[in-house]
């Protein structure tokens, strides 16, 4: 089986009349004859254009026309003339088919009562002789479903039947049925009264005419009426006085007589009635009917061209010959040509050509004028009226085309007539396209009335005239390019499966089906049934079948030739059109056609579709395997192949074999595997053929369906016979062949074999499985997979996308691990689109086979760190699906960890997506499927376990002892909180509360365990770390009961693990306590006591949590005296320790305590005399913070090493509490001293305090922006997040006081210098401060811009990214301020990169201004780019005055600017031309002077340096010209597309240490080669261009 795929089983609608219904959906013109002007067109009773037509009451009344006209007449035939009439009429009725002009639902079947001997005894002798013996032995049959017969029946028999078959139209049955429609004769038992019974006995049977006799009278009367009408017309034509005759009229514009519209209608109706009774050539005189035809043709030839104008459509029919008269006359002439056989022999070419010229004139003048009238209509009512008139006109023209199609089917036509008919097709298509283009909103179904008969005519011509096939195909393809590309406008034809396609697509399939042989065995090959049977038993079947195979082969080759002609024409044009081109209509039309063909593939009525699709596939395969084809053509071809492959895979359904009891082949890629199932397939084929015959008989438009399917099946049998080597299997195949030959000779008769619960489409789909299209399916799939290793990234991407679209791709990858490994290897492809498609494909695979997650998961998770944004997005989405699908907790933890790292991605969309996915996986109610209204205690045991499994990854992430991880978690959780609206916020709060309840219940369970082992400690640590993280993010969701549970864990700690545990507990209390409004004083006192006990032995991190918590307790208990005692006690102890030795650790702890209590405690609220309390340190004022700051300054003078750093750190803490102290003289002098000493560690401490100060300002700005954005909204978000001011120990708005701006402006030089430090941590602190400065606008951006540009070329990636972001922000907000600073930036970069005296420069190296150029180019303004380049060109613009001042450093700087200019990837060619023009002007100015010095061998130092500079400028010019392919002639070409450097090699510039002799020779040589004209001799306006 193909890749062992699991095909999809389709639910199909069962219907026994799919073929006829499928061909009924497009509305056709009514074939009822014209009668009453505009009222003669019968509109379908359905209101919708794409529904099957139904007969209305008027049509039904016309069907009963002959029954209503029955009149009693003579009871027997006694004259020879009448006898000959009946003989001819009834003979024609038995052998000739019914005319299609009258639409009937079904052919009536003989009733058993009519066929008995009593009824037959009423016939006269000649009538009995005309009836076939088979009609006398008829048996009752089931009446077929009326809906299964096409409403557009035609007159031709099925060409697949031999002359010995049953009659093509049951005319005798119609005779008997017409008699039956009269009231039946009553028996004597049915007569109720004796008087009536007596009257019945007295009357003779001859006195009451029988039903047959009455019908014979009707036939005679119809013949007499027709002859009389024809004679009246001829006599009126020859008579001069016609005033009393209504058949001819006189026009106002001339004195001649003209046949009236009334006469034409009567002739049409009379001939129609008579044609249904028999052959008109035997019933009418040939000379009379020829005269009538000549009269009509004369009328048409005398009509002026003005008659074709649409304005005459509303005139009176009796006053002027209008379009209605023209169309009626044309239809009648064509009808006469169709009815009279003599015209068939004569091939009256002149008459038909004249009629065709009339149709051409209508399409050239009338219809375009009608469309223009609609377009020019000023009101909607007028437009509606015009559209209705156009619809009426087109339906009348369609009636003429219907008759023309019958003529084309029955009458041999000359080449000129065929060509003229074919030329009608482009005109109709042009008008249809014009209507849809000018009136896109109007219903264009009226033109479908024209297409239906026209397509049928082309189908007949295509079959009957093989030499004209190429001409018909060329015309069809030429008009294909003019079709509308909008699917909603073009797809107006609805198939039987309900899908809409464009009408044009059906034409190609009709033409292909017309190539098939109609009667394979109706020739000299098989003379009779006995001979074929004799050949089978005599062993001559092989030779006999060779001839049959040769005929079939020629037929199939013709089909393939025509199909290949169509496909080659379409693909040769469509594959050349690029999607980016403005006019890619042909490519779109080709794709629409292929989609339509694929929709028709499974429908039996369009059996020729498979041939065209096969040729499509083969041509596309040749395109993609041709190395000479362009990549764009291969991409387009792969797109089309994917459509074919996906459709074929969708149709592959193994359940059909089981449904119809067929042995399924073992290998669908080998035709031999179908041999075991050939018997059953042959039986179903015979059933299918009977079904086709039943549905298509009598309709010439469907005459190709049965022969095409039969020939295809017989060809398959012959192909099997050739490859079969088993004698037993060969006998089975020969038996099937013999049965098919016999069936063809006997004819396919009988009712439809399908019942309501069966599907006639199944057998046809099964027959497709052994077609070449399905047999090559594996090859198509293998071909697509082969492009995984294509060198073109676009082809690899296309291949992966096609594979991903295949519905059976998971099973293919499952059974072919080598293909899976090939796809996985593309996860490291250079193309981001390829990597993205690989992740999508692997995600589809592991979702289908979840057991493969551990093997494939690693490839997907690597994509989350991909440099491409689209790949990271795809990886995040795929990981979300894997997280939900897997039960492996370790994988879930890993996924959550990777998603968390992406929450601070540099791309904002990635960060938002990561947080969205994490929130969905952790806190979405749908993730745990629990009732959110329930509390944790109300959950069942299984629900609790499920909840713990869901929160397991959160615990594992929080348990990592990493500050960065905790900060990332808290930031992510806060972002989830602040990004929610009020409605969604409550849901998130509910989920968090459920998580906290779960954690604290686990905490209780762990504590109550008897033994505490290492695993229990680990669980306890995970729980506490998780509570710590959530206390920072959601402190307001903690209950007071949780604090009571946590208090026992405030125990002393001796080990590192215990210290960390204590740190978590204290931090939770610090965050949660401010949000507990109702809490007992006893609990607070107890908590205060415990924290004071842990204060002395707490670690540094724990101390920084305990002190803020204690300060919060002091404020809550109003216990400021305790705070004062602690501070005073620490100061006294510190004063004592400073005079002692070996007390470093004690002093550090005391200094930290003083600094922390000063920052988080409000010392100003202590009502006491600080000067008196701290008299031991001799304070100079009464302000506690100033006293402490002065004391620390004294300590700083004598401190060294780490103690000095601690003092500076705590001085900064005091200033952070009272920010105005930062700019106090005391603190500023201290800061200046620290900065002057330039100790990196000490300055880093200051920078950290600056960052904290700026972060507070940043938060205030953020809160102000949030309030501004939420202003005016109804659901204003409540700010229940952490109190940032409390955490920072201040509530003052320092940004109002200007402290931040003053500090940053004062220390800006130091901050900018720190950005270039080799100490990475120190430089990153400076860059972070610079980022805050720019964002808050604390200094003029011009002061920082040069530093930012220099940082863009930094070796550290993080530094470069920050610099690029800052430059982008400044360019967007302050472009006018920074435009003139690029030259200054170049000077700074040069000074930073200068490492040696004689530095070497190479053209083509990375330009420090490449990132700056990219940022400036983003706004697509050439003005900004030119300003940047002109700034860098400034140092190159030299004149004679500058030459004496040349130094080595200046030469190096100019060389550096040359490197900067050469390494930029310019967007426009104008920019390299600007550089060349500047260099030329400099060479023309100073070149002759310098060259003169070199020729004189003047080796003065500044002259040699000037020569070196001149050579470097020439090198730059040559490099630019070569890199961008620029010549010295013609005008410049302005290119809008980005240019690619053709030369990425390096060109060494001359350094300052070059020898004077070499420099002199080189200057002279280069300058003479440049041929620069100096001064006034320079040609003005000389420009360059791209080669």
From Swiss-Prot:
HEAT repeats lie at residues 775-812, 814-851, 853-888, 890-927, 1101-1140, 1183-1220. GO terms for molecular function: ATPase activator activity; chromatin binding; cohesin loader activity; double-stranded DNA binding; single-stranded DNA binding. The keyword Cytoplasm does not apply. The keyword Cell division does not apply. GO terms for biological process: chromatin looping; establishment of mitotic sister chromatid cohesion; establishment of protein localization to chromatin; mitotic sister chromatid cohesion; mitotic sister chromatid segregation; regulation of gene expression; replication-born double-strand break repair via sister chromatid exchange. It is found in: Nucleus; Chromosome. Residues 147-162 have a biased composition (Polar residues). Belongs to the SCC2/Nipped-B family. This is Sister chromatid cohesion protein mis4. It comes from Schizosaccharomyces pombe (strain 972 / ATCC 24843).
